[in-house]
Amino acid sequence: MITAEERRALLDRAITTYGAPAQMDMAVEETAELTKALCKIKRAQAGCEVTAAIGNVIEEMADVQIMLDQLRIIFHRSTEEVEEAKLERLKNRLDGRNNWQGSNLHKWIEKQFSTGGDGHE
């Protein structure tokens, strides 16, 4: 198994060898391949077809993860803070604190149409 230090060195080497622009292009390609694999899995019918499709999705997920790690190196940024904020937003949505039905905009629109208003006060 590769260590974290070996992984980082290998990713740095790939960026140095191929260049950041090429690795950004490769990230686009790999995400497109994952998209295609996910679309195919929804069409899979037979057991062996489903198993192969799942294997393909897992392989493409690994490729995308490797490219995401390279993008973090290229841009000298972690996604941790942004991920935390997005997960908090998702939690709020799931907990009903940030849903459409409870939003001020929804309430305003409902009020306008329920009272026959034209949206002007």
Model-derived features with residue positions:
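Flexible "arm" and connector segments at domain edges
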Residues: 1-121
